[in-house]
Amino acid sequence: MSNPDATHPSGVPHRELGRTREKVSAIGLGGWHLALPHVDEPLGIRIVRRAIDEGITFLDNSWDYNDGASETRMGKAPRDGYREKVFLMTKIDGRSKKEAARQLDESL
């Protein structure tokens, strides 16, 4: 098994995520702020890409942040070669199997 506490060249520590064997940054970037009224889409995408360039590889979001706009922007940012560098995570709050499935479909 690889060193679970390896450090990215940027200095950001990376660890294995649970049993996945995926290495992710110990610090993540949350997506809620990416679609606030004063953050336009190009700025939101620049924020995500800058975080990735600096060694942040764990991106956290939720299907209902800013009516889905945050997730949409975070989904656009990893284009152009960035997708292979990140681990995307989203949250749902559905309390039934049907609602959880709907939210996951909406997220994808």
Q: What residue spans do the PLM features occupy?
A:
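N-terminal binding-site loop/beta-alpha segment at the start of enzyme catalytic domains
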Residues: M1-K85
